[in-house]
Amino acid sequence: MAKLNHSKKTLNNENFEAELQDRVNQAISKISGKSSTIESAISYALVNPGKRVRPLLVYLAADAIGLDLEKVDSLAVASEVIHTYSLVHDDLPCMDDDDLRRGQPTLHKKFTEAHAVLAGDAMQSLAMDLIVNDQNISADQKVRIISFLAKTIGYEGMILGQAYDIEFEDKSVSKDEIIEMNQLKTGMLLEF
């Protein structure tokens, strides 16, 4: 990916979005062709247009500390892949049971619930694979990043927040509980 034009890094910039989409497409191409349905499901989820806030934050943070933006491509794309996998799982009938995401049918509506679960799981491992295979990241940094991600998206983070979301459906909750749930589901991943 070419270095982003310093003066044009905004959420509404078409060049930024096109460059980021190119990186997402390259990430998708890492998936072998063993299951064309899963490949199609992952592609459908990732290319469905979103705001791409998380990758933008990765690039802005890198720029703020003077890093070459190309050196954080895998981190930026991984953040979007993880976010997308969380949305795929969140949309499932056993969770929020949403029919639309980003103006399109949710993945389990376009494909099947089983394919949505598998595609989400595959996106999680794809994000880790992007980081592990990035030659711009040292082995020590990879361990720290993967450890942080495991905590952030695992049972102490995003998954716990989703569990709270399910539990809160049937009871009255306080403002503090809602804030904690949102911090776990969304806020922790933004720290990435």
Where are these regions (language model features)?
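N-terminal amphipathic/basic leader segments beginning at the initiator methionine
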Residues: 1-31
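Mg2+-dependent prenyl diphosphate-binding active-site environment of isoprenoid biosynthetic enzymes
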Residues: 15, 19, 28-192
